[in-house]
């Protein structure tokens, strides 16, 4: 399990979970416009949170959640020896900042790097990064021997959200299918704002398939 990290994430989740019946919806500034079916998303989000909190809740510093795709935390991203052992060729950092991750950190390892400066806040618009992150993951896995680590600080919210979006955009999984696929290998807890944005993406993709 992730020492300390999962306990922190679980406490954070329970705080969200316990308030689900009393809070009115919060508009995510600049986020994808939600279609009518998710304009009042708490029931849908509540059900997703219940799904997220069932089944596998353990995690390692990195878990392979899709062939060649590892979801992990900052500690594994800093461990060059472990990155070599796993054969990582690309790193997507969803908690990029001047203090956390730069391309220079992987000089000499032959690792391609993409940083997304995201905040683990329900008000943060992660949806603007969905396509670019999914494209980067796809390019990594399309090259021979390509393996990618997608990480943030803990590896359960920001990075997990981008992995779910990738599975939806490139493999046409529904959001529920993507969550179940990832949770077969790692416990994740995207924050409520990220879940709303994923629901909006899910609806848009489903409408596109039906058109």
Curated annotation (Swiss-Prot):
Q: Which SMART domains match?
A: DSPc (SM00195)
Q: Which domain of life is it from?
A: Eukaryota
Keywords attached to this entry: Cytoplasm, Golgi apparatus, Hydrolase, Nucleus, Protein phosphatase
> Where is this chain's protein located in or outside the cell?
Cytoplasm; Nucleus; Golgi apparatus
Q: Does the keyword Transmembrane helix apply?
A: no
- GO-annotated biological processes: negative regulation of MAPK cascade
Catalytic activity, reaction form: O-phospho-L-tyrosyl-[protein] + H2O = L-tyrosyl-[protein] + phosphate; O-phospho-L-seryl-[protein] + H2O = L-seryl-[protein] + phosphate; O-phospho-L-threonyl-[protein] + H2O = L-threonyl-[protein] + phosphate
Name all Tyrosine-protein phosphatase domain ranges. 60-207
Q: What is its EC number?
A: 3.1.3.16, 3.1.3.48
Question: Which positions are catalytic residues?
Answer: 152 (phosphocysteine intermediate)
Q: Name one Pfam family in it.
A: DSPc
Please give the Gene3D superfamilies that the UniProt record associates with this protein: Protein tyrosine phosphatase superfamily (3.90.190.10)
Give one GO molecular function term: protein tyrosine/serine/threonine phosphatase activity
- Asked whether the keyword Nucleus is assigned, the reply is yes
Q: For this UniProt entry, what is the primary localization, expressed as one broad class?
A: cytoplasm
- Spell out the GO cellular component terms annotated for this protein, sorted alphabetically and separated by semicolons: cytoplasm; Golgi apparatus; nucleus
SUPFAM superfamilies recorded: (Phosphotyrosine protein) phosphatases II
Known InterPro entries for this protein? Atypical_DUSP_subfamA, Dual-sp_phosphatase_cat-dom, Prot-tyrosine_phosphatase-like, Tyr_Pase_AS, Tyr_Pase_dom, TYR_PHOSPHATASE_DUAL_dom
Q: How does it assemble?
A: Interacts with HSF4.
Function summary: Inactivates MAPK1 and MAPK3 which leads to dephosphorylation of heat shock factor protein 4 and a reduction in its DNA-binding activity.
**Entry's family note:** Belongs to the protein-tyrosine phosphatase family. Non-receptor class dual specificity subfamily.
**Name of the featured protein:** Dual specificity protein phosphatase 26
- Native organism is Bos taurus
């Amino acid at each position: 399990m992730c020492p300390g990290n999962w306990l922190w994430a679980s406490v954070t989740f329970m705080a969200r979970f316990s308030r689900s019946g009393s809070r009115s919806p919060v508009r995510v500034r600049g986020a994808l416009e939600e279609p009518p079916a998710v304009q009042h998303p708490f029931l849908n989000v509540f059900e997703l949170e219940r799904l997220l909190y069932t089944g596998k809740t353990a995690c390692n510093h990195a878990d392979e959640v899709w062939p060649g795709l590892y979801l992990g935390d900052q500690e594994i991203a800093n461990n060059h020896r472990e990155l070599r052992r796993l054969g990582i060729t690309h790193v997507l950092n969803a908690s990029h900042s001047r203090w956390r991750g730069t391309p220079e950190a992987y000089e000499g390892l032959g690792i391609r790097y993409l940083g997304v400066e995201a905040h683990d806040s329900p008000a943060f618009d992660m949806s603007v990064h969905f396509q670019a992150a999914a494209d980067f993951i796809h390019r990594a896995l399309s090259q021979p021997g390509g393996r990618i680590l997608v990480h943030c600080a803990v590896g359960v919210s920001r990075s997990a959200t981008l992995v779910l979006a990738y599975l939806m955009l490139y493999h046409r999984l529904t959001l529920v299918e993507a969550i179940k696929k990832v949770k077969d290998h790692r416990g994740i807890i995207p924050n409520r704002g990220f879940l709303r944005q994923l629901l909006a993406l899910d609806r848009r993709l489903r409408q596109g398939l039906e058109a």
